[in-house]
């Protein structure tokens, strides 16, 4: 059975991707900051819910290493993201830092955890989604 590790699985693309892969015979490791938001995902066959906050480097290491110790992961899907709305010039610094900590640094730290695994097994895929917010304005 193929296995995919998905970040940001509590809503949106991550949630729907979890459903898709689970319904097509894959094992899905669905990660999210708040596992209580898993809802019906926890009832799907072959779905494993794990906590993962991309602003927490220690949790990134722990969750990634737990998943890799228990499952032979084929695909890493970096999907989690932090969104901001409003005029750029009015965005507070702490919100900008949260965005970079999640979308850039957190994503890079997760990816670092999986590269040795994929090298050792001589295969694997890393997918990363981005937001249209980098292309279009999202006024408040």
Regions found by a protein language model. Give the residues of each.
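Conserved glycine-rich cofactor-binding loop
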Residues: 10-11
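The beta1-alpha1 cofactor-binding region of Rossmann-like NAD(H)/NADP(H)-dependent oxidoreductases
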Residues: 52-62, 93
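Conserved NAD(P)H cofactor-binding loop of Rossmann-fold oxidoreductase domains
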Residues: 79-84
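A short, exposed helix-loop element centered on a Lys and neighboring polar residues
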Residues: 111-112
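Residue(s) in the substrate-gating loop at a strand-loop-helix junction
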Residues: 131
